[in-house]
Amino acid sequence: SGFVKYVYNHFGISIERICRDQAQGGRKISKSELKPGDLVFFDTYDKNGKLNDISHVGIYIGDGKFIHASTDLHNKIAIESLSSSYYSKRYMCARDYISK
């Protein structure tokens, strides 16, 4: 969420710091509406295979991929596929902060 805030601030877009709060702003969009710059949200805490709460965010970059600060890589920036076995099961929602 800090990475997303940094990138958005760089482009003059004000956004909350915490991913749960980021998921409340902008405009809710479906996965089929995703375009580069949209935010994608996940529940990365495994609670018996159920999605409970947003705990991670990335920036969609197109072609089914997103960029994010990976906790598995000690907060290094990584590009992942939304269709990966890990993230496809944990996807929760997407928000558009850029379109007016």
Predicted regions and their residues:
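Catalytic cysteine-centered active-site loop
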Residues: 1-36
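Aromatic- and glycine-rich peptidoglycan recognition patches
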Residues: 51-100
